[in-house]
Amino acid sequence: NSMEGWVMLGRVQRARGHFEESAEALGKALALSRDDNLSIERAEVLAQQNGGSFAGEPWAIIQRVLTADPHHLNALFLAGSASYAEMNFRSALRFWERAREVVPADSPDAPELDRAIAEAREKMGLPAIPPRAAGATADTQASKATLAATSISGRVTLVKELKGLV
């Protein structure tokens, strides 16, 4: 009755396409140890079991995780995907933009997230924004301000014994 054993069984069953058995095994793992990442994984499996629909329990799980941790990255990704699947592009955009705030520009997830945001904006008839452009500009300005604030200027005079050594 180990949590790790149930998780492994759940993942194997998911890989085999046995979503009902996977959801059951992940549920048993969660009964032994509450873990938000595992809850999100179970929500994905339940949605797969329901033909890709996040209605009902999968959506309730996502909302519960986001209530406990509004910055939970996997929950934000999944909430955006669930909203997009329901053609709620405004909600999808909101979740993905929240995720974008915490995903570093050099993350392997960044391009996928930027594409999802661009698609949602397009579906809503909003103008496209270059990926990471707004954040990069702010970062550049902040870096220049930090450098200016930490610069030191002055004049150094060496004694004649050290002049040849420097």
What role is predicted for each listed range?
Residues S2, R11, D35-D36, E44, H72, S81-Y84, D106, E119:
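Residue-level recognition of tetratricopeptide repeat
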Residues A133-S151:
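Beta-strand-rich domain onsets/edges
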Residues Q48-G56, I117-T137:
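Alpha-helical linker/edge segments of TPR/alpha-solenoid repeat scaffolds
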Residues L30-A31, Y84-P108, R115-E122:
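TPR/TPR-like (Sel1-like) alpha-helical repeat modules
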Residues M8-D69:
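Alpha-helical adaptor scaffolds
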